């Protein structure tokens, strides 16, 4: 006995075939934009869980977890910034970047910490802040196992292992591993520059410690410790 077709006039196998062909067509369209995808749509949730990034840019090989993110990324290569701020005229590739930028003008801070009530302009800043309360440190060093709450702190720490010093002083070419260390160092050059109060005023080259009341003891102490740099604190003739 022959089995009849299900209601609707289309067999189940034919329906599955059409769905498969539809996915293949979508895949071919996305591959034109440099996208690599999988046909199984049920994998999308699992991809997010394991940080899988199947959508790849053909221009720079950067990968993304969502096709919409790749589409926005490709605007970087085209150079088109279609989202413009009405207040200052600055343009952005993505509407989300414009929304974040607008908060500079409006002062809006929509992201609130439930623990302490502090508010933030960006959700990423709130996530970083919440780790103060939770103690979470997801960024770990492969060399020594030390963990940090922010990726920027891990990057700074890793320079203790690599010896990298990317911040260079323009005055003396001395290099530092952290920008804060460079800023602290730059004060040395500012202290050395002469400050004149009048036409016949004496030139002062003493460091800040002299002004703070630490006097000659502090300067003498620096001369003893530094040795070779003692000449920096001598008066000009």
Curated annotation (Swiss-Prot):
Gene Ontology MF term list: DNA binding; zinc ion binding
Compositional bias segments (type: Basic residues): 188-217
Alphabetical list of Gene3D superfamilies matching this protein: Classic Zinc Finger
UniProt entry tagged with the keyword Nuclease: no
Gene Ontology cellular-component terms listed: nucleoplasm; nucleus
Main function: Binds DNA through the consensus sequence 5'-CAATG-3'. May be involved in transcriptional regulation and may play a role in tooth formation.
Name of this protein: Zinc finger protein 22
Species name: Mus musculus (Mouse)
